[in-house]
């Protein structure tokens, strides 16, 4: 199976292209920058997608309807995260990112080196000075640079953690999200998805206050099986089969169902420091029960 987390755009090129336009979603930048600075960066990134063909429509801007939905959620101790969403669709997400790729290739002095490892990052006296590049044939050369940006995505997350440890850069465990993908008839979720497209809801359980949240909602979408190969520098010991959800922009491709992920988020403390391996191990146990595939329950 293809490794969908690598090469140009990684998983982003093979997703249904939801752009979440809120500082409350998708990371912790507000821990390092002011809210205004983060919003400026989100707007800048969003404008890039628009320049390369993303649709202009944004869901979740009707404050009155959002207020009504949030009020209804509050009756059940559910918090609705306000988040405008621009949806490109599975069939157009790839095209938008390909347009970016084609644009960059035309820039003088800009070069893509596919199937080339940048490892190790060269560090001299505590200062990064470049990286060693190794192509698919095993030919290596050292490249000098004033700045090295390491952005390997999910496929290289464990590799990046190893680089940080190697250079004595402190890291912090992210939450570990374990859950299932739920599929229901559109009629169950239409009152949410027609206005918000994706309803991001958070609930804390009564007994242990476990954080439960919805994620990656796909109105009229499909559930797909995906395989994550061993990954960046064979980060993973074996391929794992997981589920994802997609939704197309073209209404002719819509189904009668809506799917979404329901995740339990857990923050571990010391001495635990392997959140990626933990999540992968849980997925591998599920694959073991099915002989290597995904598990379906009705």
Regions found by a protein language model. Name each.
Residues 1-32, 59, 63-298:
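Residues forming the flavin
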Residues 33, 37, 43-51:
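Conserved catalytic/binding loops enriched for acidic/polar residues
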Residues 55-56:
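Compact, glycine/acidic-enriched structural inserts
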């Amino acid at each position: 199976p293809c490794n969908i987390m690598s090469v140009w755009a990684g998983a982003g090129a093979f997703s249904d292209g939801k752009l979440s336009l809120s500082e409350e979603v998708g990371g912790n930048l507000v821990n390092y920058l002011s809210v205004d600075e983060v919003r400026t960066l989100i707007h800048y990134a969003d404008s890039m997608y628009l320049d390369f063909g993303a649709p202009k429509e944004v869901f979740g801007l009707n404050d009155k309807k959002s207020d009504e939905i949030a009020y209804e959620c509050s009756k059940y101790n559910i918090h609705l995260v306000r988040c405008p969403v621009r949806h490109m669709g599975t069939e157009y997400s790839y095209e938008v990112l390909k347009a970016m790729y084609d644009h960059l290739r035309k820039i003088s002095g800009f070069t893509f080196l596919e199937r080339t490892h940048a490892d190790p990052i060269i560090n001299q006296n505590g200062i990064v000075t470049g990286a060693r590049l190794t192509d698919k044939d095993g030919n290596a050369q050292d490249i000098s640079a004033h700045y090295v940006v390491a952005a390997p995505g999910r496929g290289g997350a464990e590799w990046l953690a190893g680089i940080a440890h190697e250079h004595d850069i402190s890291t912090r465990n992210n939450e570990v999200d374990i859950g299932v993908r739920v599929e229901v008839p559109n009629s169950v979720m239409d009152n949410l998805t027609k206005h918000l497209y994706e309803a991001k809801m958070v609930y804390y359980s009564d007994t242990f206050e476990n954080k439960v949240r919805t994620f990656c909602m796909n109105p009229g979408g499909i559930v797909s099986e995906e395989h994550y190969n061993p990954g960046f520098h064979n980060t993973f010991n074996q391929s794992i089969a997981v589920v994802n959800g997609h939704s197309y922009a073209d209404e002719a491709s819509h189904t009668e169902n809506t799917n979404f992920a329901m995740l339990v988020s857990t923050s571990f403390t010391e001495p635990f420091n392997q959140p990626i391996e933990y999540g992968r191990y849980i997925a591998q146990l599920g694959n073991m029960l099915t002989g290597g595939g995904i598990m379906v329950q009705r």
